[in-house]
Amino acid sequence: MIKKTVDQLNNLSKIINQNKTALCIGTFDGVHKGHKLLLEKTNFIAKKNNLKSLTIVFKKRPREFINKNENQSYLSDLNFRINKISQQGIDYIYPLDFNNEIKNLSAKEFLCFLKKLANMNHLIVSEKTKLGYDQLSGDDLFTLCENLKLELTFVKMNKLNEQIISTSTINSLIKSGKIEKANIYLGDLYNVKGKVIKGDQIGSELGFPTANLEISPEILAPGDGVYACYVNIENKSFFGALSIGYRPTLKNNHERKIEVHIIDFNKNIYGKSIEISIVKKIRDQVRYESLDKLKKQIKIDINNIFQILKSKKYE
């Protein structure tokens, strides 16, 4: 729930007041199973020690600030991350800008900053975490926390079949169209939100009207292909056939399109914001010899997608 979000520094001090906190910190892009393990541990420690659980969420990745050439797309925007973290039962969420001041702090200075900012008593981090410009980690970080009279807990990296669950791994899977595996790592369906814009009406001419989606350039769109998905419009869910790519059968196909045919839906939704929850890749983008052959394939795709979503065979 967004009401748990603390927007201003002074508000954080008022809310925390005399309550010491168990704190975890990160960007939490995608809020995947690895993040959820960290959040669960934070909640557990907070309840066990009569503390408040607090998650500090960097609005942007710190490495973007350090390395201006960093350009990896995000899996989720800030609002999505806050909502997902809130669903894990965290008491308070504080969005934080990573800036020059924070960038130039040593690990000791950064811990003192967190202690003062959030009345931190216990820090929970992954075993691979490095803090400060001096990149303190492991035993050195543990010793520093002891000296500052802070508790520190390392959480082991969450793995699936010996593969570490990480945002970068999920990013690569989604780029390559391996959406089902990405969803397993996420612990949820990959979600893309965007605004419906005017298209060229080719879908309508073929008998399968589509909603053309404009998404934030910062958010990752899956690799080219046809996908089974759910479409959420004003809190109502519909089955959808999602197409991403350059539409190789059509002329003037120089622009990558994200468009979804919403099954058994015929309302005007231009200008509305919709959410796509992507379930499974059905096939690659293919160039057909004629529009008739494309039309036949779309019909097959929609039937396959309907059966998959109806039977929930992807679960």
Question: Which positions does each model-derived feature cover?
Answer:
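Residue-level signal for inorganic ion chemistry
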Residues: 32, 85, 123, 182, ...
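N-terminal Rossmann-like or analogous alpha/beta NTP/dinucleotide-binding catalytic cores
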Residues: 64-148
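Generic structural signal for residues in well-ordered beta-strands
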Residues: 2-3, 93, 152, 276
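N-terminal catalytic cores of NTP/NDP-binding nucleotidyl/phosphoryl-transfer enzymes
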Residues: 12-77
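Phosphate/ribose-recognition catalytic cores of enzymes acting on nucleotide-derived substrates
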Residues: 199-315
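Short acidic-hydrophobic, aromatic-tinged amphipathic segments that line or gate anion-handling sites
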Residues: 2-13, 94
